[in-house]
Every structure is written in C-alpha cells, then in structure tokens.
C-alpha cells in the first residue's frame, strides 16, 4: 500500500465516523444547521457524499468501484432510515437523491482523472 493510499483511507474513515456521528445527534445540537434552507441542505448532502466517495475511490480499496460506491450509498440510506425513527430528525427522499448526485459526481471526476 502506498503512503497516499493509507492517508486517504484514514481520511475516509474519519469522514465516515464524523458524518455518522453528526447524523445521529439531534439537529439542534449542530451549530447553524437550522439556518440551512432546502437547497443548501441538499447541496451539503451532495458535497458530503462527494467527499466520502472521492476519498473512498482514492483509497484504492480492493473492492470494485461499483461495490464501494454502493456501500457508501447504503451508508446514506441507513442514516435516512435512522432519521425516520429519530425524534429530532426526519427521513427525506431528496436527501438520498442529493447523496447519490455527490457519489456520481465523485465517480465522474475520478474517472476523468481530474481528482
């Protein structure tokens, strides 16, 4: 494993843990989250899942790209399912679509070797 692969893997896991934590605490405990409108919330979802996806792709895991990105999408789906049952959160289908757009954008950029 190259040095950069390890670096990206560490960032990938830190990102997953951070997003997982921020997704299960009540939204009112996150500063400025209430100030987000619908569009900025969806943009934030896309950027977060772009970040996670590009870090996962740059990590050079032995998983295939489709499998890695499917697992990242399932991570987002699990978060939304948790939100459905969370008293201070709510499930939004649009969040899943924003997550998916971030994942596809990361794949597109990675495939074009821009990353």
For each predicted feature, which ranges?
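"…centered on the first transmembrane helix and the immediately adjacent amphipathic helix/loop
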Residues: 1-54, 68, 72
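Membrane-helix interface segments
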Residues: 6-7, 61-69, 92-93
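Alpha-helical transmembrane segments of multipass membrane proteins
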Residues: 17-20, 54-55, 77, 81, ...
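Short helix-capping/hinge motifs at transmembrane helix termini and TM-loop junctions
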Residues: 25-26, 60-61, 87
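Interfacial helix-loop-helix junctions of multi-pass membrane proteins
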Residues: 30-38, 79-100
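Alpha-helical transmembrane segments that form the membrane-embedded catalytic/substrate-binding core
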Residues: 45, 49, 91-110
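Structural signal for the C-terminal ends of transmembrane alpha-helices
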Residues: 56-62, 108-114
